[in-house]
A protein has these predicted regions:
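Structural motif
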Residues: 8, 54-56, 101-102
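Conserved catalytic/switch belt of AAA+ P-loop NTPases
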Residues: 29, 68-92, 123
């Protein structure tokens, strides 16, 4: 799929945004999957989006402008072109193959091409908290069963 939606979990602290998206990743890719964050310069984001099939970027309450640009490239399916190191005129191309999910308490995605591709889920704060390690164990124990329903 060339263009991709961007799944976004929005809610207050303690609403399970990160836990929910982490579980999706663990169902798809196993127990070692985890969410990530991006630095203000977003230098490592291109590496993430060209080497993974699913990336969860956590706590995007004040995303840098460069992140909005990167999200637009992801959503529209652009190819990332770079000059090959130590060469003058050789170019490398990297396909953006991942789907991106975001978490935010107060989303600030103002670019219309990004906002149009967001699939937002709004979560409320839990009244009763459950231990995330136990939730992970339950999901991992039932992973095969969960995946069999998706096929």
């Amino acid at each position: 799929m060339k263009t991709k939606p961007i799944f976004t979990a929005i809610g207050s602290k303690g609403s399970g945004k990160t836990t929910f998206l982490r579980r999706i990743g663990q169902i798809l890719f196993g127990k070692k999957f985890d969410v990530t964050s991006v630095a203000n310069d977003c230098k490592d984001l291109e590496t993430l989006i060209t080497n993974n099939y699913y990336v969860v970027i956590d706590n995007l309450d004040n995303p840098p402008k460069t992140l909005n640009d990167a999200l637009a490239r992801i959503a529209t399916g652009q190819i990332i072109k770079k000059r090959k190191l130590f060469t003058t005129n050789q170019e490398l191309e990297f396909e953006v193959k991942c789907y991106v999910a975001l978490t935010s308490r107060t989303p600030q995605f103002t670019r219309d091409d990004v906002a149009d591709r967001l699939i937002c889920i709004y979560l409320e704060r839990f009244g009763l908290f459950k231990d995330e390690n136990n939730l992970c164990k339950v999901v991992m124990d039932k992973r095969d069963e969960i995946l069999s329903y998706t096929i």
